[in-house]
């Protein structure tokens, strides 16, 4: 029987480690967090030292039971969850559960950490156990408590003032503000015209282009020429003076070094995977998790291919450095090796939480060697990690930049530049991606012919080119992660979840690979920026993150931080609940006056989303409403465009003695005849669609509906229907199976009723009714961690919890 129990977070990791440790160990997975705050008000109690009440997570109950069962027979227990705050908290929760159940009285329980899943790393960790780091646990608990208090208290204010079902998060909201402010910059941007002038030179050795840098003796700047007439006049003056040639006045050669980027940390891995591979942050972390936990490599079995992927550290272990340097010498020559390893400095004060950068566990496993065992996406990400780590330990690239000035007379000067690689260095392996290219990037790789001062170069022609200034680009995932990192908002473990939350809550949409805020997102951001300014302030959020870091290092206590945050936050929430109306909330935009009725026209967030409205609730007549068309926004729609929307519904005519009309509803454009509604196709415009097309769509839908019904029964709700997976029986509430050996159309009512009794399942999924009263709750106290007594546990009854879930937790408490 195994003597030791080792607990990790994922089953894949458990499988890999179990292979390394052998029969003396049982390796089990917790499947992530095992407990969370109880889903009801008071889960964090500011009046009682911010005591926190926990509940087992439903889906992980069986895994906790498996761990408990194994712990009873084990001689010792090792907690081997991830080497960061979340991992430390999971270990603490597991230890508390086992302690509550009386399983730690006579056996040692220790914490071990490792940043790679290799036999050496696992065995070394077991030889160097430690106690659970209470500072890391405190930092995680403080973060969780802050997120709960913000979400639980701020989200209901959004429900009342903006729209039901919305949520606000401590870190999510500043990230949303970034995206919204960028969109406002884009909308406010005024395009300016400007012109550039180029000389096409016909050098005998090679044709090349040169850009005008001086016109009429003055420096040529971006807006020196802003119209075509001025550009054409300048072109004529230069051509007249040049007389078919340009005179070389200066040739400059300059060498510069480009140093390799450090090995990946979480944020740079996410940014590069977005730029080079087109991966979302979520996909990057999911694939990296698989590579970290273990991939089956044929006879070698399951092997962890990369180190832990949630890290702020750019350090590499001595063993890793030695192996990487051996690879460089073998594959790229000793000339590609620096005299000593390249050392990089991390920006994060907390990089000690996870001790290494993201790197291959063994550089000897080249991307080519492991390719047969990896999916295409896994291979591409592994290759990225491998190349970045290897390149980080190579010599700099040496680039030579040549700059040539060519004059037309004494008043006009052009400049040609080119950059060539003299020594490849790390560029032989890897080149870092960029979000936006600049002029230097355009010159790179461009060679110029050998030229000397005093020579003349034949001029082929002078070209003018029109340009327009461009607004700042929307944030891509890579750019947003970079901005969050630069502001100090969020941490490696949270970037992907921040983005996922914004998308899930429909506060932003993806337009191509860029974020565009939705009207709901803009309304939420505007409301928070106007009335909870401090709590979406970038510096405030970053400072709070720094204080959480300080707690994790043991430099600050978590209770004083909670008090400092909670007292003013609570006062502000209470004030705003009663003092604001929807106009103050920023979800209403006045557009002007309707010329027909003389009433006010506004854009606003309604119950079902963005809409426009004619009139107000104070008018004698009820206000009229109209939904927006796709790609319209209440923040940019004009008065004329809004009034156009009220032409809906349009009556197209009659068909089958019934009126046919089109309109725009909460789910988009539709056509209607009698009681039959059908959504318009993407190519159909509700403002131009004709009667023939609308009736075709309606008839098509009715034909499909007729074919769906195989059999009706007189005086009964039961029908025999065609479904996605074949024929079935339904009474609208239950769906039942039809035996494969029965002809659906031949079923009698009695047979159908019996089949519903025997095989019927709810037509719609119901919420889980699993009881929670028997679960353990614990509190995290200011002075010590202890379990609640039996009476406290019994207070968490079934019905109040479910009621609270429905009424209060719907906002989703997020960062």
From Swiss-Prot:
Site (Interaction with DNA): 33, 143-144, 147, 159, 310, 505
Enzyme class: isomerase
Residue ranges of the region described as Interaction with DNA: 167-172
MF terms (GO), sorted A to Z: DNA binding; DNA topoisomerase type I (single strand cut, ATP-independent) activity; metal ion binding
Pfam families: Topoisom_bac, Toprim, Toprim_C_rpt
Location of the Toprim domain: 3-119
Annotated catalysed reactions: ATP-independent breakage of single-stranded DNA, followed by passage and rejoining
SMART domains: TOP1Ac, TOP1Bc, TOPRIM
Biased composition (Basic and acidic residues): 774-801
Listed GO biological process terms: DNA topological change
Keywords, ordered alphabetically: DNA-binding, Isomerase, Magnesium, Metal-binding, Topoisomerase
Binding site for Mg(2+): 9, 82
Cofactor names: Mg(2+)
EC number: 5.6.2.1
Domain of life: Bacteria
InterPro entries registered for this protein in UniProt: Topo_IA (IPR000380), Topo_IA_2 (IPR003601), Topo_IA_AS (IPR023406), Topo_IA_cen (IPR013497), Topo_IA_cen_sub1 (IPR013824), Topo_IA_cen_sub2 (IPR013825), Topo_IA_cen_sub3 (IPR013826), Topo_IA_core_domain (IPR023405)
Active site: 308
Renumbered residue ranges of the record's region Disordered: 760-815
Ranges of residues in domain Topo IA-type catalytic: 133-573
Recorded family membership: Belongs to the type IA topoisomerase family.
Cited NCBIfam families: PRK08780.1, topA_bact
Subunit structure: Monomer.
Role played: Releases the supercoiling and torsional tension of DNA, which is introduced during the DNA replication and transcription, by transiently cleaving and rejoining one strand of the DNA duplex. Introduces a single-strand break via transesterification at a target site in duplex DNA. The scissile phosphodiester is attacked by the catalytic tyrosine of the enzyme, resulting in the formation of a DNA-(5'-phosphotyrosyl)-enzyme intermediate and the expulsion of a 3'-OH DNA strand. The free DNA strand then undergoes passage around the unbroken strand, thus removing DNA supercoils.
HAMAP family assigned: Topoisom_1_prok (MF_00952)
This protein's name: DNA topoisomerase 1
Gene from which this protein is expressed: topA
